């Protein structure tokens, strides 16, 4: 695969045209386009291991053929740190039976700030020999090492990496736990955060955030409003978000572990939730809602919930479901801002953002 600028520009223009066509029925403005580095943009990578000629190799499989491995020596789309670590880790397992025995998968997680973690997955219990070898590996490579085996986990160092991103002239620190979702393209993520920060603007009222994850958007957006009520269902993400709020001294956010559907019931006073004890929903003066839903988009009830708000800031990883949600809201809201974020260069996937404002 070649990574030349001309091919990249052609692919990016195709994505812009696709987004433009999907949003054309809603009189959307021309999208702002945020491009990606051509290489070394991906901060995480996962490889299976494949034995050939008595040696284990990094391997991946194409979506069309799950049986034939593609052996990998380097991975140009991954961060420079991952590419530096790959041969050193391979040399380490080749020289160490405790590290290599029944090792079947390796995961790397890195950050723009230079932090790194390696997860090693095994088809066997981990013993003291593994622990000693993994501790030496962590020291040699200056990384945290996680060992996984049948639901058990051994941690050498930390079970998270720390990312630092600049938004609106302020640097935010993010704890990103092993196994939790993080944005894979750090450079584009930072551009996306700054776009959302500018799109929301300085406000005197409150923000509702659905699907807040580890607080990726929550931290900078909280500095633009009076108060934030944020929801997330993943316990790992909730704990990371709480840690990130504390670490960054952001004290105007209340985080509740509810699904978007449950929050809709709570706001409609359908039934009480124990997890909302101590939260006075009537004290909020919501002017805006921020949503970053999964690929399926918002379900119809959640979409109706967002209609209550004058401003809907929507980040989408699936432009088709974004368009379907906008179609539901189009009679009351219009697109005033639109953006394409090329989180996934060299694929057909794209991230997009819109600001919908009440007519």
Swiss-Prot record:
The keyword Cytoplasm does not apply. It is an enzyme of class 2 (transferase). Pfam families: tRNA_U5-meth_tr. Dual-specificity methyltransferase that catalyzes the formation of 5-methyluridine at position 54 (m5U54) in all tRNAs, and that of position 341 (m5U341) in tmRNA (transfer-mRNA). InterPro entries: MeTrfase_TrmA_AS, MeTrfase_TrmA_CS, SAM-dependent_MTases_sf, TrmA_MeTrfase, U5_MeTrfase_fam. S-adenosyl-L-methionine binds at residues 183, 211, 216, 232, 292. The gene is trmA. It comes from the Bacteria. Keywords: Methyltransferase, S-adenosyl-L-methionine, Transferase, tRNA processing. The active site is at 317 (nucleophile), 351 (proton acceptor). Belongs to the class I-like SAM-binding methyltransferase superfamily. RNA M5U methyltransferase family. TrmA subfamily. It comes from Pseudomonas fluorescens (strain ATCC BAA-477 / NRRL B-23932 / Pf-5). Signal peptide: none annotated. This is tRNA/tmRNA (uracil-C(5))-methyltransferase. Gene3D superfamilies: 2.40.50.1070, Vaccinia Virus protein VP39. One of its GO terms (biological process) is tRNA methylation. GO terms for molecular function: rRNA binding; tRNA (uracil(54)-C5)-methyltransferase activity, S-adenosyl methionine-dependent; tRNA binding. SUPFAM superfamilies: S-adenosyl-L-methionine-dependent methyltransferases. GO terms for cellular component: cytosol. The keyword Transferase applies. Its EC number is 2.1.1.-, 2.1.1.35. It catalyses: uridine(54) in tRNA + S-adenosyl-L-methionine = 5-methyluridine(54) in tRNA + S-adenosyl-L-homocysteine + H(+); uridine(341) in tmRNA + S-adenosyl-L-methionine = 5-methyluridine(341) in tmRNA + S-adenosyl-L-homocysteine + H(+).
């Amino acid at each position: 695969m070649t990574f030349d600028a001309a091919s990249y520009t052609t692919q990016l223009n195709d994505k812009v045209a696709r987004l433009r066509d999907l949003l054309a029925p809603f009189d959307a403005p021309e999208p702002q386009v945020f491009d990606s580095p051509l290489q070394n943009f991906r901060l995480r990578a996962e490889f299976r291991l494949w034995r050939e000629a008595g040696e284990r190799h990094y391997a991946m499989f194409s979506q069309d053929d799950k049986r034939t491995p593609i052996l990998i020596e380097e991975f140009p789309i991954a961060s420079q740190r991952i590419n530096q670590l790959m041969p050193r880790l391979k040399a380490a397992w080749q020289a160490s039976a405790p590290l290599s025995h029944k090792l079947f998968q390796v995961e790397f997680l890195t950050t723009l700030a230079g932090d790194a973690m390696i997860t090693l997955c095994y088809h066997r219990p981990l013993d003291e020999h593994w622990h000693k070898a993994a501790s030496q590996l962590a020291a040699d490579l200056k990384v945290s090492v996680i060992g996984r085996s049948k639901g058990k986990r051994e941690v050498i160092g930390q079970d998270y990496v720390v990312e630092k991103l600049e938004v609106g002239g302020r640097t935010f620190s993010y704890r990103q736990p092993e196994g939790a979702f993080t944005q894979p393209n750090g450079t584009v993520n930072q551009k996306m955060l700054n776009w959302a920060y500018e799109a929301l603007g300085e406000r005197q009222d409150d923000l509702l955030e659905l699907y807040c994850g580890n607080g990726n958007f929550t931290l900078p957006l909280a500095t633009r409003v009076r108060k934030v009520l944020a929801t997330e269902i993943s316990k790992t993400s909730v704990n990371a978000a709480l840690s990130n709020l504390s670490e960054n001294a952001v004290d105007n956010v209340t985080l509740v572990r509810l699904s978007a559907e449950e929050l809709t019931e709570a706001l409609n006073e359908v039934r009480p939730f124990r997890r909302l004890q101590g939260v006075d929903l009537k004290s909020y003066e919501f002017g805006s809602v921020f949503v970053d839903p999964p690929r399926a988009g918002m379900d119809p009830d959640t979409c109706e919930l967002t209609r209550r708000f004058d401003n809907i800031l929507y980040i989408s990883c699936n432009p088709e479901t974004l368009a379907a949600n906008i179609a539901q809201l189009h009679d009351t809201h219009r697109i005033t801002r639109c953006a394409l974020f090329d989180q996934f260069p060299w694929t057909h996937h794209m991230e997009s953002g819109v600001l919908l404002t009440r007519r």
